[in-house]
Amino acid sequence: MNAMDLSSYLRIQAHANALSNQRLGQALLALDADAWQAPRTSFFPSLARTLNHILAVDHYYIGALHGEAGLREAYAAFQPCASADAWLQRQRASDLRLVAFCAQCDPEAWVEMPRADHVQRDRAGHVLAHLFNHQTHHRGQVHAMLAGTAVAPPQLDEFMMPSEAHLRGPDMQAFGWDEAQVYG
């Protein structure tokens, strides 16, 4: 296993993000459409609205990391997922783009993000730190909202240490990943 450096950390975080979303998505599949849309206590007051917010923001920042144009327009045109299944499929595709980016990432590279009145420029490592924080923050809200349903919230934080491979085996298999891809 390689020593921990920033590039390794970002690669591990991208994988952890995808695995957490996969676990969360599998739990969400047990909900009916009413539970997916039901009003709940949170900043975005439903599972659907919170998860669609995560996905829309992911698309924006991952697009910026990849140097894509038209990000503000794409964000404004974002079409929310009508079901947990649709969200899981689209989130997985987004997560795989992020994993691919982090596998080759230069944390010092500049990233441009168009805003209403300027273009924000930050290093890729800083953008990724912000993105991972955003995902974790809102995923925690989803976890809390899920606790108010008939579906038990899944474990999201006790399976990513290198010594915990036995806790993530099925999750890794769902992506076709091995330990070397995550930890080097």
Question: Can you annotate each of these PLM segments?
Answer:
Residues 2, 11-76, 115-179, 184:
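Short, contiguous alpha-helical
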Residues 6, 10-13, 83, 87:
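Residue-level preference for long, well-ordered alpha-helices that form the structural scaffold
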Residues 6, 31-33, 80-83, 103-107, ...:
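General structural signal for secondary-structure boundaries
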Residues 69-109:
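Helix-adjacent hinge/juxtasegments
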Residues 110-114:
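Short acidic-hydrophobic surface loop/beta-edge motif
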